[in-house]
């Protein structure tokens, strides 16, 4: 199991981040940040009132020994509601990608994460965390649908330990063949 205990402890000790969710598997830690916490509805600019909090949080993450050297994928996700014709962005693909880019840029420029560790992806509504269908196969409605949409609007930080060969290459680069 990937060691995510330091992040888990930090989340428990800091109620400001109680809406963040952490899941660990054998090879990675997935930290889910709700879009409602980070961005205004339909926007890709981090809310001014939480930017410093987010920087502090990401600084804590950056300094966790258990994540040292990990590759980090920043994934943006939206709900299944199409953007209006008057929206700032063309569609949920663009919005999800820009949200991931915004968080990754903050991580690199303000918090000091190394760019070579970070990759960015936008998935629109194609990878829901909470399904839009109920147990009986019918589409959710009412509060169940609203809760599914809320859960699916998120940015995920996925920390993965590189394969042994990649870690070795980083410490012992191959000589130039030329």
Residue ranges of predicted features:
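Periplasmic peptidoglycan-binding/tethering modules of Gram-negative envelope proteins
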Residues: 1-72, 161-178
């Amino acid at each position: 199991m990937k060691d995510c205990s330091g992040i888990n402890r930090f989340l428990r000790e800091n109620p400001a981040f109680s809406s963040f969710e952490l899941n660990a598997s054998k090879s990675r830690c997935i930290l889910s940040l709700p879009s409602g916490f980070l961005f205004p509805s339909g926007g890709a600019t981090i809310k001014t009132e939480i930017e410093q909090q987010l920087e502090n949080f990401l600084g804590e993450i950056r300094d966790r020994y258990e994540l040292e050297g990990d590759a980090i994928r920043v994934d943006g996700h939206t709900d299944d509601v199409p953007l209006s014709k008057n929206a700032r962005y063309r569609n949920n693909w663009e919005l999800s990608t820009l949200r991931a880019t915004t968080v990754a840029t903050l991580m690199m420029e303000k918090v000091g994460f190394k760019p070579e560790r970070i990759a960015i992806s936008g998935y629109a509504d194609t990878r829901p965390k909470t399904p839009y269908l109920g147990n009986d196969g019918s589409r959710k409605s009412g509060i169940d649908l609203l809760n599914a949409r809320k859960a699916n609007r998120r940015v995920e930080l996925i920390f993965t330990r590189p394969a042994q060969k990649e870690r070795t290459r980083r410490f012992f680069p191959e000589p130039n063949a030329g």
